[in-house]
Design a protein with these regions (language model features):
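Terminal low-complexity, poorly structured segments
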Residues: 22-25, 130
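Acetyl-CoA-dependent GNAT
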Residues: 3, 8, 13, 17-20, ...
Length: 200
Protein backbone atom coordinates (compact mmCIF):
# COMPACT_ATOMS: atom_id res chain seq x y z
CA UNK A 1 0.00 0.00 0.00
CA UNK A 2 1.42 3.38 -0.93
CA UNK A 3 0.44 7.03 -1.30
CA UNK A 4 2.13 9.52 -3.64
CA UNK A 5 2.24 13.24 -3.98
CA UNK A 6 0.74 14.80 -7.08
CA UNK A 7 1.59 17.95 -9.04
CA UNK A 8 5.12 19.40 -8.73
CA UNK A 9 5.38 22.84 -7.15
CA UNK A 10 9.14 23.41 -7.68
CA UNK A 11 10.07 22.94 -4.04
CA UNK A 12 13.70 21.79 -3.60
CA UNK A 13 14.44 18.47 -1.94
CA UNK A 14 17.54 16.40 -1.32
CA UNK A 15 17.11 12.68 -2.04
CA UNK A 16 19.59 9.92 -1.24
CA UNK A 17 19.74 6.17 -0.61
CA UNK A 18 19.04 5.14 2.95
CA UNK A 19 21.63 3.24 5.00
CA UNK A 20 21.56 1.44 8.34
CA UNK A 21 22.48 4.75 9.96
CA UNK A 22 19.00 5.96 8.96
CA UNK A 23 17.20 3.13 10.74
CA UNK A 24 15.60 5.16 13.54
CA UNK A 25 14.64 8.02 11.23
CA UNK A 26 13.11 5.59 8.73
CA UNK A 27 11.11 3.92 11.49
CA UNK A 28 9.72 7.23 12.71
CA UNK A 29 8.90 8.35 9.18
CA UNK A 30 7.25 5.04 8.29
CA UNK A 31 5.04 4.99 11.38
CA UNK A 32 4.12 8.66 11.11
CA UNK A 33 3.25 8.69 7.42
CA UNK A 34 1.25 5.46 7.49
CA UNK A 35 -0.72 6.70 10.50
CA UNK A 36 -1.30 10.12 8.93
CA UNK A 37 -2.48 8.56 5.69
CA UNK A 38 -4.44 5.48 6.75
CA UNK A 39 -4.66 5.41 10.54
CA UNK A 40 -8.29 6.55 10.61
CA UNK A 41 -9.37 3.35 8.82
CA UNK A 42 -8.45 0.92 11.59
CA UNK A 43 -9.26 -0.02 15.15
CA UNK A 44 -6.42 1.05 17.49
CA UNK A 45 -5.35 -2.54 18.21
CA UNK A 46 -5.22 -3.43 14.52
CA UNK A 47 -3.19 -0.33 13.70
CA UNK A 48 -0.76 -0.89 16.57
CA UNK A 49 -0.25 -4.53 15.60
CA UNK A 50 0.55 -3.53 12.02
CA UNK A 51 2.93 -0.74 12.98
CA UNK A 52 4.84 -2.87 15.47
CA UNK A 53 5.32 -5.76 13.05
CA UNK A 54 5.82 -3.97 9.74
CA UNK A 55 8.00 -1.14 11.00
CA UNK A 56 9.96 -2.87 13.73
CA UNK A 57 13.69 -2.18 13.81
CA UNK A 58 14.34 -5.79 12.83
CA UNK A 59 12.00 -5.63 9.84
CA UNK A 60 13.49 -2.36 8.60
CA UNK A 61 17.04 -3.60 9.13
CA UNK A 62 16.23 -6.57 6.90
CA UNK A 63 15.07 -4.21 4.16
CA UNK A 64 18.08 -1.92 4.44
CA UNK A 65 20.55 -4.79 4.28
CA UNK A 66 18.82 -6.70 1.46
CA UNK A 67 20.77 -6.10 -1.79
CA UNK A 68 17.60 -6.73 -3.79
CA UNK A 69 15.79 -3.84 -2.09
CA UNK A 70 16.45 -0.11 -2.01
CA UNK A 71 15.08 2.75 0.08
CA UNK A 72 15.44 6.43 -0.75
CA UNK A 73 14.88 9.22 1.76
CA UNK A 74 13.93 12.79 0.90
CA UNK A 75 14.87 15.84 2.95
CA UNK A 76 13.48 19.34 2.64
CA UNK A 77 16.37 21.35 1.19
CA UNK A 78 15.10 24.38 3.05
CA UNK A 79 15.71 22.56 6.33
CA UNK A 80 18.90 20.69 5.60
CA UNK A 81 21.05 19.75 2.65
CA UNK A 82 21.73 22.45 0.07
CA UNK A 83 22.53 25.31 2.43
CA UNK A 84 24.09 23.19 5.16
CA UNK A 85 25.15 19.67 4.14
CA UNK A 86 25.82 18.64 7.72
CA UNK A 87 22.31 19.61 8.75
CA UNK A 88 20.85 17.24 6.20
CA UNK A 89 22.00 14.25 8.21
CA UNK A 90 20.43 15.52 11.43
CA UNK A 91 17.13 16.78 9.98
CA UNK A 92 14.19 14.42 9.77
CA UNK A 93 13.34 12.95 6.35
CA UNK A 94 10.01 14.00 4.89
CA UNK A 95 9.31 11.14 2.46
CA UNK A 96 10.58 7.76 1.33
CA UNK A 97 10.15 5.09 -1.31
CA UNK A 98 10.92 1.37 -1.10
CA UNK A 99 11.52 -0.78 -4.18
CA UNK A 100 12.39 -4.44 -4.57
CA UNK A 101 11.31 -7.81 -5.97
CA UNK A 102 7.58 -8.19 -6.49
CA UNK A 103 5.79 -10.13 -3.75
CA UNK A 104 2.19 -9.33 -4.72
CA UNK A 105 -0.24 -12.27 -5.00
CA UNK A 106 -0.85 -12.24 -8.75
CA UNK A 107 -0.47 -15.24 -11.09
CA UNK A 108 1.36 -13.19 -13.73
CA UNK A 109 4.19 -12.11 -11.44
CA UNK A 110 7.46 -13.58 -12.67
CA UNK A 111 10.85 -14.02 -11.06
CA UNK A 112 12.77 -10.80 -11.59
CA UNK A 113 9.71 -8.55 -11.68
CA UNK A 114 10.00 -5.37 -9.61
CA UNK A 115 7.63 -3.66 -7.20
CA UNK A 116 7.20 -0.20 -5.77
CA UNK A 117 6.44 -1.44 -2.28
CA UNK A 118 5.99 1.81 -0.34
CA UNK A 119 5.80 5.48 -1.22
CA UNK A 120 4.90 7.88 1.58
CA UNK A 121 5.13 11.64 2.09
CA UNK A 122 4.55 13.62 5.27
CA UNK A 123 1.38 15.68 5.51
CA UNK A 124 1.82 19.19 4.18
CA UNK A 125 3.99 18.09 1.25
CA UNK A 126 1.38 16.24 -0.77
CA UNK A 127 1.49 18.73 -3.67
CA UNK A 128 5.23 19.30 -3.66
CA UNK A 129 6.08 16.99 -6.57
CA UNK A 130 8.18 14.88 -4.22
CA UNK A 131 6.19 11.72 -4.84
CA UNK A 132 6.88 11.95 -8.56
CA UNK A 133 10.61 12.48 -7.93
CA UNK A 134 10.83 9.44 -5.67
CA UNK A 135 8.72 7.35 -8.01
CA UNK A 136 10.97 8.16 -10.97
CA UNK A 137 14.11 7.25 -9.02
CA UNK A 138 12.67 3.93 -7.86
CA UNK A 139 11.31 3.01 -11.31
CA UNK A 140 14.67 3.77 -12.94
CA UNK A 141 16.45 1.60 -10.37
CA UNK A 142 14.07 -1.29 -11.00
CA UNK A 143 14.41 -0.94 -14.78
CA UNK A 144 18.17 -1.39 -14.49
CA UNK A 145 17.41 -4.96 -13.42
CA UNK A 146 15.55 -5.58 -16.70
CA UNK A 147 12.28 -6.97 -15.31
CA UNK A 148 9.42 -8.16 -17.48
CA UNK A 149 7.02 -5.96 -15.50
CA UNK A 150 6.72 -3.55 -12.59
CA UNK A 151 3.95 -3.87 -10.02
CA UNK A 152 2.45 -2.14 -7.01
CA UNK A 153 -0.55 -2.31 -4.73
CA UNK A 154 -2.85 0.65 -4.12
CA UNK A 155 -5.93 1.08 -1.93
CA UNK A 156 -9.07 0.61 -4.03
CA UNK A 157 -10.63 3.84 -2.70
CA UNK A 158 -7.57 6.01 -3.30
CA UNK A 159 -8.54 7.48 -6.66
CA UNK A 160 -5.86 10.14 -6.52
CA UNK A 161 -3.07 7.61 -6.09
CA UNK A 162 -4.47 5.49 -8.89
CA UNK A 163 -4.41 8.47 -11.27
CA UNK A 164 -0.84 9.20 -10.21
CA UNK A 165 0.31 5.68 -11.03
CA UNK A 166 -1.51 5.74 -14.35
CA UNK A 167 0.78 8.60 -15.37
CA UNK A 168 3.71 6.24 -14.84
CA UNK A 169 2.18 3.63 -17.13
CA UNK A 170 0.55 1.37 -14.54
CA UNK A 171 -2.82 -0.22 -15.33
CA UNK A 172 -5.26 -2.34 -13.33
CA UNK A 173 -4.26 -6.01 -13.22
CA UNK A 174 -6.03 -7.53 -10.22
CA UNK A 175 -7.12 -7.27 -6.61
CA UNK A 176 -6.11 -8.61 -3.22
CA UNK A 177 -6.61 -8.10 0.51
CA UNK A 178 -4.03 -6.13 2.48
CA UNK A 179 -3.83 -7.21 6.12
CA UNK A 180 -3.72 -4.64 8.91
CA UNK A 181 -4.17 -6.50 12.18
CA UNK A 182 -7.49 -8.32 11.84
CA UNK A 183 -8.66 -5.87 9.17
CA UNK A 184 -8.48 -6.62 5.44
CA UNK A 185 -8.26 -3.73 2.98
CA UNK A 186 -9.51 -4.09 -0.58
CA UNK A 187 -6.47 -3.32 -2.72
CA UNK A 188 -5.92 -3.02 -6.45
CA UNK A 189 -2.86 -4.55 -8.09
CA UNK A 190 -1.53 -2.41 -10.93
CA UNK A 191 1.08 -3.40 -13.48
CA UNK A 192 3.42 -1.72 -15.92
CA UNK A 193 4.31 -4.20 -18.66
CA UNK A 194 7.67 -3.59 -20.31
CA UNK A 195 8.72 -4.18 -23.89
CA UNK A 196 12.26 -5.37 -24.45
CA UNK A 197 13.22 -2.07 -26.07
CA UNK A 198 12.24 -0.19 -22.91
CA UNK A 199 14.43 -2.41 -20.73
CA UNK A 200 17.65 -1.68 -22.58
Amino acid sequence: MSIPTDTPQSRPFTIRRATRADLSALQELSITTFTQTFGYLYAPDDLQDFLESTYSLNALTTLLTDPQCAVWLAFDAGVGGDTNPDAQETSQPVAYVLAGPCSLPHPDVRSGDGEIKRLYVRQGLQNSGLGAQLMSIAVDWLLERQPDALWLGVWSRNDRAQRFYERFGFTHAGEYRFKVGCHRDHEFIVKRALHASLRQ
